[in-house]
């Protein structure tokens, strides 16, 4: 039978990890560092869905602070979590509004890798455009959008 792993305080490890991910998303929504040092390892590897990659916590903090001077995350909604060993996948919907008027929104997932003490040592985001369509709707020859 499956036995839920718990930490020394009796809190399920899955719940603790979900709480950490929610805190990270909340930091973006509130534009406030509420514990970046507490949730990421010093040598974290963070990869955004569109290629930027940050190879330590200091750079993640700089990116967080600098990005929030240019825009605001208005929605970062968690849809579901999946857990396996030292990894978690979280599915989400994201929307931001930049100071220049640009608005971005997309669906995504993050693959999170944890240390033994439940700090994030790697996080890789994957994004999916919400403007989907069927290229075969009108014919057997695909009609792709530009």
Give a label for each model feature.
Residues 1-2, 27, 37, 85, ...:
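Generic secretory/membrane-interface signal
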Residues 2, 30, 46, 54, ...:
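Sequence-level detector for tyrosine residue identity
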């Amino acid at each position: 039978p499956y036995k839920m792993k718990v930490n020394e305080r009796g809190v399920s490890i899955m719940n603790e990890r979900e709480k950490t991910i929610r805190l990270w998303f909340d930091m973006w929504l509130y534009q406030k560092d509420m514990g970046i040092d507490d949730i990421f390892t010093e040598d974290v590897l963070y990869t955004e869905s569109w290629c930027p990659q940050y190879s330590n916590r200091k750079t993640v903090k700089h990116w967080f602070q600098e990005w929030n001077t240019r825009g605001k995350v208005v929605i970062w909604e968690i849809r579901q979590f999946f857990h396996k060993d030292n990894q978690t996948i979280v599915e989400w919907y994201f929307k931001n509004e930049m100071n220049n008027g640009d608005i971005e929104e997309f669906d995504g997932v993050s693959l999170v890798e944890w240390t033994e003490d439940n700090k994030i040592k790697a996080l890789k985001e994957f994004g999916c455009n919400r403007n989907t369509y069927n290229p075969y709707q009108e014919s057997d020859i695909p009609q792709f959008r530009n």
